[in-house]
Amino acid sequence: MTMSFCALLFFLIISPTLAATKSAADYYVRSLPGAPEGPLLKMHAGHIEVDAPNNGNLFFWHYQNRHIANRQRTVIWLNGGPGCSSMDGALMEIGPYRLKDNHTLEYNNGSWDEFANLLFVDQPVGTGFSYVNTNSYLHELDEMAAQFIIFLEKWFQLFPEYERDDIYIAGESYAGQHIPYIAKAIQERNKKVDDKNSARWNLRGLVIGNGWISPAQQYPSYLNFAYTEGLVKEGSSLAKDLDVYQSVCESKISAAPNAVNIKDCESVLQQILSRTMDSERKCYNMYDVRLRDVYPSCGMNWPSDLVSVKPYLQSRDVVRALNINPDKKSGWEECSGAVGSTFTAANSVPSVQLLPELLESGVRILLFSGDKDLICNHIGTEQLINNMKWNGGIGFETSPGVWAPRRHWTFEGEPAGIYQYARNLTYVLFYNASHMVPYDLPRQSRDMLDRFMRVDIANIGGQPADSRIDGEKLPQTSVGGHPNSTAAEQQAKEKIKETEWKAYAKSGEAALIVVIIGVTVWGFFIWRSRRRNRGYEGVYQKELGSGSILERFQNKRSGAGDVEAGDFDESELDTLHSPGLERENYAVGDDSDEDDPNHPRPTASSREDGTHP
């Protein structure tokens, strides 16, 4: 009797710990509402705690690559803001799916998961599906990078089979600040690691699209871009008025050259948008000047896919499928005004100052721009390159006074843009593209990525794209539909039975789970009730249209109310309910014999278990 009671008491004490300790299986996405017919792509999603005292958790959504080319690669994708969700990238840009409507997904022809594992992360804490107590939002870029290292350490503990992949960090807009800081933090972490006990992470490259990297070059470019695109006529009375604002901006930059945000410079963009409205009070879309929008939104209602993304991600079925923690009490919002207004980076230097050392350390960097974006336009990016010194030269110098040529890129017979390269830095200008290049040109953007990662498809097959620079046909990359090739399709079929049973295993410990299942369920309810008591308060945010352009950007589409404390709208979630489709789960391209021999993939069973957007 006493022994039985003691045993029960022991299990009750340790059960919360067992329940709180997660494995890869707890993150496995077994079904995804609205997914296309056929086997479901291999994916994991959920939260990882990065700040226990303040209930800080980052949300991730991971897709395993469809095919392995010559080596294993992982691309980490971040959107900007700060405070804008990387689900923008997942569902509107580079992810394998896009939304046809509020309930239905379709394949994205040109998704970046063809030859790379994709890891989307909502960060900093409080962004998208991530959460934290509202008095604990981050302020500085080094704080953000430190938390991201904590996230990666824990993520690789859950998924050790990816830890020796070649790592590329990609993103757009304000992620142009985040990415170099994270890269520097990874290098600092690697210096302290004993490779015998913990792996050094193979950081290979950074990919930044329409990046907010160098405010000192980006702010003055607004007016030059307006002249170049014909939004404002040079020498006109409007141009003279705007010159006054430009002069104030330039003086502020001279006084504070290391500032990340300068409100007086944002007035230039505000004036361009407000003073170029048409007779219907429609302003230019700051993300794509080929379009117009109602004032003062000026692009906040873009892109059109957003009308489906928000209700889809707020659907109960999707929230359940993506393993969202009960602690996340508010529905998904694209951008958090609370996060953006707190993340001032007042004591941080612009990330452009980190680029030379990263380039000189051997990290390759790709900067790309859509030519129709105003807010983070290509003129500013080109100016930062021209003024930057690294690896013994300035800008795209190949030798003193000689600059690398701007080479013309064609894709499937059509002009696609410009390529330029020197000393580990590549620049690509996309023609007829917006702030979100992969949204407009998914296949061209994937072609760019594959070339930058030096993908070799010799062992894969498939139909390569006709991609040329200055008329010279480039090495073959395949950017066709899904599956990539008949060989890969056959390989997938052979893998189905092998991997199906593993989808529900838990790090090879299924038998143990059966034994302790009853105890852990009991412990889960105890743990859950404790965690729920660690809630957080809300912070009221400004209405759209108030404040500076960047403040509006950070408050973008986050709703008129509080984004961090607002409960789910029960009736809305019921209306948006879409039946979850149970699908066959499988992975493509697991064979270790296709890996780089210098980067063997561990056989850990856990892999199979489970301001600017």
From Swiss-Prot:
Record-linked PROSITE patterns: CARBOXYPEPT_SER_SER (PS00131)
**One GO CC annotation:** trans-Golgi network
Regions of this protein lying in the Cytoplasmic compartment:
528-613
Q: Report the subcellular localization.
A: Golgi apparatus, trans-Golgi network membrane
Glycan attachment residues as annotated in the record: 102, 109, 424, 432, 484
Q: How does it sit in the membrane?
A: Single-pass type I membrane protein
User: Positions of the region Disordered?
Assistant: 463-490, 559-613
Q: Which Gene3D superfamilies match?
A: alpha/beta hydrolase
Asked whether the UniProt record includes Transmembrane among its keywords, one would answer: yes
Q: Which UniProt keywords apply?
A: Apoptosis, Carboxypeptidase, Glycoprotein, Golgi apparatus, Hydrolase, Membrane, Protease, Signal, Transmembrane, Transmembrane helix
Q: What does this protein do?
A: Protease with a carboxypeptidase B-like function involved in the C-terminal processing of the lysine and arginine residues from protein precursors. Promotes cell fusion and is involved in the programmed cell death.
- Output this protein's name: Pheromone-processing carboxypeptidase kex1
Which organism is the protein's source? Aspergillus clavatus (strain ATCC 1007 / CBS 513.65 / DSM 816 / NCTC 3887 / NRRL 1 / QM 1276 / 107)
